[in-house]
Amino acid sequence: MANALRRFTEYAPANPDLMVALMLLLAVSMMVMPIPVMAVDALIGFNMGLAVLLLMAALYVSTPLDFSSLPGVILLSTVFRLALTVATTRLILAEGEAGSIIHTFGSFVISGNIVVGFVIFLVVTMVQFMVLAKGAERVAEVAARFTLDALPGKQMAIDAELRNGHIDADESRRRRAALEKESKLYGAMDGAMKFVKGDSIAGLVVICINMLGGISIGLLSKGMSFAQVLHHYTLLTIGDALISQIPALLLSITAATMVTRVTGASKLNLGEDIANQLTASTRALRLAACVLVAMGFVPGFPLPVFFMLAAVFAAASFVKGDVLDADKVDATTVTPAESQTPNVAAQPNPIGVFLAPSLTNAIDQVELRQHIARISQLVSADLGIIVPPIPVDVDQQLPESQFRIDVEGVPVEQDLINPAQLSLADDLKKIESSGIPFRHDPETHRIWVEQSHEPALKAAGIRHHSPSELLAMRVHATLTCHAPRLVGIQETRQLLGRMEQEYSDLVKEVLRTTPIPRIADVLRRLLGEGIPIRNTRLVLEALAEWSEREQNVALLTEHVRSGMKRQICHRYGRHGVLPAFVMERETEDVVRCAVRETAAGPYLALEDRQSEALLSQMRQVFSSTAPGQTRPIVLTSMDVRRFVRGFLTRNGIELAVLSYQDLASDFKIQPVGSIRLPPSNGTSGEPRSIRPSATTG
């Protein structure tokens, strides 16, 4: 016997699959074959031990996924317990005996009173059925539903983190497997709780069958008196019911513990999790101790008991307080070397405003920051980019009354601002008629008035700008000019992350063919020409269509512009009309022939006289537009458009250059002139500046 037991203990751990199969076969056998009384005692003990083991395992797992086999274990345990109930019922009815465990348990619980035993059984069964099983069933049902509903969002989040480089492919597969396992676990637990609930109902039915069957057999077959039959079979029936319901109760607690777990990042077991959260607030512990002390003074309550409990709560609060204080000291303690080490890795602000010390008191700092914040919101809404916070600091090195605007730590603008003057926004005639003294600056075309005349300006209804508003306007110009510098790989990732919430398939398709640095390059090129990227969907759709066919980023940007033609025309036109200077075909050929291909990329190399002629004409276009009028665009072919635009930008001329592919069908072109250059080998005649169009009248 000892050798057989030793061989079994060596064989079982190595073959758990066979042990499960053996357990199921044993359960089926118990339903159809008579079992010796000694074997029934052993199986009852095994059933109790298995229930206790499952409960302990559920208490000590860190996450429900660590015990994902629980639904299957519930099924096996329920089948085994029901088969054991069938076996004990057969023994009770056939032999009037069910083993020493059932007899002893029944005698102990009944304590000589049948009613007591029956009531205890009903209480245990109702607690299991109405409270534990029903509550756990509802939790499992809701958890399964919510887990399945959240599954697509979690999968998209994993895809986004993988694309953004936050996790690798192995981690992505691991997380996907965990998600799949979690969804299957909660779905299976939803069904497994039906086993637990049905088990408690079966216990009520079985006790009735055993009582009625036992009394009938005792009276009719064994010739026992009614009192003997009632005592004997009631003792065995209640003992059998309780010995079956207690493991079922433990299994209900196990299942309820698993489905009600809320796993945190620390991944503690249930006891540690509860202890940490209950003792997290020392104030709560001390208040509970005070309440217990007060309850001890209620007449009839045992004062020593409540005092002892209050002392335990108070001691726990003081111990926890000491631990928290020690943690705070450890967190705030740094070595002298650490405290004196400068933050050499600090990155400069993308955009910063610096004032001379004399301006800090002369300009309202709160008003200035409000104006800058409003300007940032306007630029963000106009261009579709995220404008970072713009700090306003003091630079002791700046001369008096000067300010400086830095972009990525490099000064891009530095000028003088007079805090005692206001800039007027109305026309000159209105100001002259008001009689308020002013000064006109012919270089900037601004009209200045001393700040002391501000009440008179308000009374006359003349619009004006304060020094803080003027400075905010300079910030606006800087933001618009340097918007491409605010869009990098990180900002592109954030933009795609926001788009993925609504257009997940589109983002996935774009990232399949286009790396993020390339997308960022396209966005910067668009912003560099003042094209907003608010409608990111159009940009991504054009990238998805053209990225595989066009590897050149500059040409890819041209195709993206074609996809945004309506937005481009709306930006430069008015009332569906685009005034345009058209570049003649011969001039386009001159530009086309002047493009030089190098390893660093193509560039435009016009002859000096051609450059001068083109600049002369463009400056006439630029200066011919009166204030308030729509500035004409320059219209040319797609292949030379970016070279013409780059040539103008390098020479300080901000004119929109559009290709024919940028024109939307619902906008009309109003030619106002043509642009013509002499051929590269031409020597005769002076170049004509601008040839007016015959349609302009």
UniProtKB/Swiss-Prot annotation:
Q: Where in the cell is it found?
A: Cell inner membrane
Sorted alphabetically, which InterPro entries does this protein's record hold?
FHIPEP_1 (IPR042194), FHIPEP_3 (IPR042193), FHIPEP_4 (IPR042196), FHIPEP_CS (IPR025505), T3SS_FHIPEP (IPR001712), T3SS_HrcV (IPR006302)
- Single biological process term from Gene Ontology: protein secretion
Q: Where is the composition biased (Polar residues)?
A: 680-697
Instruction: List residues traversing the bilayer.
Output: 20-40, 42-62, 67-87, 107-127, 200-220, 235-255, 293-313, 372-392
Instruction: Recite the UniProt keywords alphabetically.
Output: Cell inner membrane, Cell membrane, Membrane, Plasmid, Transmembrane, Transmembrane helix, Transport
* Source species, domain of life: Bacteria
- NCBIfam families hit by this protein: hrcV
| Membrane topology term | Multi-pass membrane protein
Signal sequence region: none
Q: Could you identify this protein by its name?
A: Probable translocation protein y4yR
Q: Gene3D superfamilies from the entry?
A: FHIPEP family, domain 1, FHIPEP family, domain 3, FHIPEP family, domain 4
The segment annotated Disordered runs over: 675-697
The text of the family note is: Belongs to the FHIPEP (flagella/HR/invasion proteins export pore) family.
Q: Does the keyword Ribonucleoprotein apply?
A: no
Kindly state one GO CC term assigned in the UniProt record: plasma membrane
Function statement = Could be involved in the secretion of an unknown factor.
